[in-house]
Amino acid sequence: MNSEKISYPKQACACAVSLDLLGDKWSLLIIRDLFRGKSTYSEFLKQSQEGIATNILVDRLKKLLAMGIIDFRRASHDKKIKKYFLTDRGIDLYPVIYEFQRWTLKHVDFDYTDNTKNWNDLIQNTPQEEV
């Protein structure tokens, strides 16, 4: 576990810093996919309907690794395969992903995937804490 803080050289508000570090679509979708059980480059590339380009996937994985949000282990059956996982720092982003999804389901009319439908059904039956 990396408890050392991420260095950020500019003076800014916390919201601006977090958006600068994590606010791009692909980083958040990789984090979402890790929460959903995906763990390999191939799974991120082929099993996400958003269709991330290979160069962007490589870049974002490196960025998330450098920030200590994810890490990897080599697969036991094939040492060439990296199995990515969320670190404690990455797991701390769960409420962010959760609230983005909850906000979208509440305020945006869109055609959503089976994963989103299942997740929505689950949270409809989960008591919400007052913020």
Regions found by a protein language model. Give the residues of each.
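Basic, amphipathic "hinge/linker" alpha-helix immediately C-terminal to the N-terminal HTH DNA-binding motif
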Residues: 23, 76-99
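Residues within the helices of the helix-turn-helix
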Residues: 42, 62, 82
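Amphipathic alpha-helical dimerization/coiled-coil segments
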Residues: 95-131
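Canonical helix-turn-helix DNA-binding module
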Residues: 47-75, 79
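N-terminal helix-turn-helix DNA-binding core of bacterial DNA-binding proteins
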Residues: 13-56
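Recognition helices and adjacent regulatory flanks at domain boundaries
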Residues: 1-13, 17, 21-25, 47, ...
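Short, charged/polar surface micro-motifs in flexible loops or helix N-caps
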Residues: 36-38, 63, 90-91
